[in-house]
Amino acid sequence: MADQLSLRLEADQLPDLPDLRPMMARPLPAPFDSDEHLFEPWWGGARALVYVGPADLAGAGDVRVRDATGQEIAAAFPELAGLAVRIAARSAILDGELVVVDGSGRADPVALAGRLAGEPGRPAAFLAFDVLHLDGRSMLSQPLIRRREALRRILRPGDEVVAVPAIATEGVALYAAAVAQGIAGIVARQRSSPYLPGVKSRLWRFVAATPAGGTTLAGGATSDVPPDVLPEADGPAAAPVLALISRLPFDED
């Protein structure tokens, strides 16, 4: 009983999670290689911040999902309600993209747009790439590589959430793979970059995938691209998110 009371007091003493807005990337016309950057796929999903509050004695934590404008959208994605059990922390704010994956393991922007509008459909997943707040401590001033280390440490992947891996240096190769796999593009983030809430910064750049035909592959929802763009999703009930990620040649950062 004493241990349970201690756990409750420890959770109650945590500060309220801050109200943040996503840091945004600026566009570039072409991919590049750089030892100073980490490169990730731009899935074309809906940008979102996931807030995970302290777990109660039953192990269930408060989960809130907010879009890039700060609007609460958790009600549209009940499948994310149990996400707290996959976070090995008392509280956290994660940044990432919501996607819906089709049967071929590709992101489906139309299906995601339907889910955002409250329509029933295939389950969504949250592809996390950053952690902004952890166990009552701000992570905003920490460099990206430290925040990503923390993210990988606390997140246990599952059908509804996964930490997106990155590749070091080889942005051109990742871009070529993204184009070949029909993925929306890539994002380059400076390894040393702090997190600047609500800022569109040159510390982060995105390159939309353009196949030989000349039109971009991104299409229809909202992300950190103009004006907050699209998803890549859809997929079998098994583990569509992991299948999506496995299409690309990642080295751990």
Model-derived features: positions:
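Catalytic cores of nucleic-acid ligases and guanylyltransferases
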Residues: 1-253
